[in-house]
Amino acid sequence: MPSSSFTTGLALGAGALVGANAFVAPTAKTTNLRAPTQEASLQVAASQQTEQPAPSTSALPWAFGAGACLALAAGGQRKQRSAIAQGRATVLPTASPVVRRALDQSSRYADLSLSEEQLIANGKHVLVSYIMKPKAGYDYLATAAHFAAESSTGTNVNVCTTDDFTKSVDALVYYIDPENEECKIAYPNLLFDRNIIDGRAMMCSVLTLTIGNNQGMGDVEYGKIYDIYFPPSYLRLFDGPSCNIIDMWRILGRGTTDGGLVVGTIIKPKLGLQPKPFGEACYAFWQGGDFIKNDEPQGNQPFCQMNEVIPEVVKAMRAAIKETGVAKLFSANITADDPAEMIARGKYVLAQFGPLSENCAFLVDGYVAGGTAVTVARRNFPKQFLHYHRAGHGSVTSPQTQRGYTAFVHTKLSRVQGASGIHVGTMSFGKMEGDASDKNIAFMLQDDAADGPYYHQTWEGMAETTPIISGGMNALRLPAFFENLGHSNVILTAGGGAFGHKDGPKQGATSCRQGEEAWKLWKAGVYGSVSLSDGVIEYAKTHEEIKGAFLTFQKDADQIYPGWKEKLGYTGESSVQAASFDWKKKAAAAAFAGSSTQARTVGVQMRHGYDDVATNTFYYDKRLESFGQQEFFNQVGYLPDGTPMNTAGNLTNHPETIGPDPHINGSELPQAVFVNSIGYLPDGTAMNQAGNAVNHPETMGPDLHMAGSPLPPPLKGYLNDIGYLSDGTPMATAGNLSNH
């Protein structure tokens, strides 16, 4: 009896025999065929079929043989079937003589009498402006109406379930300009999905309707969003940013108004560095710069795992802050497919940065990971700067792409979603695709009211999103960029501009800061009525770092600063010393336990919980644990003998990490509590009582750990790198050796 697979093969063979009159044998000509459109494909296929002889009975042996072969193939291994399939050419069916036309729905989904001004005044519609072109032979209004129908309540036929309410939420075409391919559609606010947990709006619903199925319609050549307007009542349902560059300025000690350029970089190479070299690169840049970000593909690669590289970054930051006296910032990539993974990454990073947590931003690849990832970060970590990276956006936003939406629309949506900052390219002043008019993107992100290509958007106090400029920028390109934009209140991430500088990343970072200063001095008239380029050259004569940028990026210098060699007296040599840094010095530097704003008091700066005003009680918040770090800090608590925890054990084992005790004798001790889930001292004292029995009896809580029950998970236990007790016992085993 034949096997089931062989029987299946015979059936396939019979199918091939029956279909012998319907298809032609593949030829080399069809193998290389590339069809740009379906209609063209069908026409080519039809012309090729006319070249073939009509099937006859002589084809039957061939068909039967093919059927037998198919039977054997089906009865063989999967690998054999794959090999046969790969060897076959695609055969196209004969073109159908029937030309399908879309249902003309303009009587329902179009109302050209509607006034845009009135639609905006009513505030009940999201307005979207498209560049849309129907395919040849299709009426513009009918296609636009079909476009609106497919984007809202309709389909390609009338359905019996439609009622009056359904029609009341139809999307409506209210303006067309066929000659310029312009089409505007009004979407009722009620169409868009809302959260069931809090009633808030969701961007995925906006995109599903406005840029969803309409991108694949058979009667549309292309359609692309060029502007979108959100009415105030609907805009308020989105999160918007929770922090932005103002918070960075505050951390950097620059106030909250016109704090200027945040000089940043991307660690280069973008991939391939292991943890320690990565930390070294951070330390080197922070000698002159403010801000470092993970590049968008950096995360948790096997050769550079987060639990190894983040501690190196923290060490580098502490050392750089101590040596420069200036705060530093880092943006850690927490992008992942799984929201739980994103949250886990974020919590881990915050635990490692501890009291420097406010100096840490979270980077999310917002385009490739989607709006869900942006919202996960925004809602779970509202106190962190949400760094929106747009890698991949060019596939839909590029001017060369006629579908999707523009870069302007993309960045506008990021503000609505809650991005603290988003990359905006370089407005044609760097290597990325763009135009000088892209400054309107920055205006839409930062102003409370701004004009887009088609709509005037009022933000009603929604926090601004900070433009992040990157892509081929260096000190020489910055002055003209600032002049085009009109200000320098942006974040710069110059990878090559810093690490490509001939004298190293410290000088590269400093040169970028000098590029901003040179522009400001020229703007203030310090150099008289000379051109901007001549003003920058005058500045460079007395500033070696930006002069080094001229010597490094000579092609840029030739293009932007004609005659710079003669004006700077360039001889081919540079007086700038090569940058260097000592990793051992960095590793041995005293840990900087403070945050970045020295004006803050220890009591405010080091709190790790919250006060219940009603009961005047301080509650410890595990989410703000700071002592799970490389050393103890005195704000956590004191041992029973009064020894601050930043010196306990470290006095014997790690003297290089001991910093000054900021607590003033006689003043109120920092009110934080050890919780018993952390561990026990060797004498059995639970850590929620250690020291507090003497210094903070009012904060002592019950010991929640039951004898014999499992200890808390490792991440909430002591880790070896936290520190040592005075007798040398590592904190991972302190107390547990005796008690557990």
From Swiss-Prot:
Q: Which residues cross the membrane?
A: 56-76
Which reactions appear under catalytic activity for this entry?
2 (2R)-3-phosphoglycerate + 2 H(+) = D-ribulose 1,5-bisphosphate + CO2 + H2O; D-ribulose 1,5-bisphosphate + O2 = 2-phosphoglycolate + (2R)-3-phosphoglycerate + 2 H(+)
Among the GO biological process terms of this entry, one is: reductive pentose-phosphate cycle
Where is the site labelled Transition state stabilizer?
431
Which cofactor does the UniProt annotation name? Mg(2+)
Q: Which residues carry this modification: N6-carboxylysine?
A: 293
Q: Which GO terms describe its cellular component?
A: chloroplast membrane
Question: Where in the cell does this protein reside?
Answer: Plastid, Chloroplast membrane
Instruction: State the top-level EC class.
Output: lyase
Q: What does this protein do?
A: RuBisCO catalyzes two reactions: the carboxylation of D-ribulose 1,5-bisphosphate, the primary event in carbon dioxide fixation, as well as the oxidative fragmentation of the pentose substrate. Both reactions occur simultaneously and in competition at the same active site.
| Self-association state and partner proteins as the record states | Homodimer.
**Protein name as annotated:** Ribulose bisphosphate carboxylase, chloroplastic
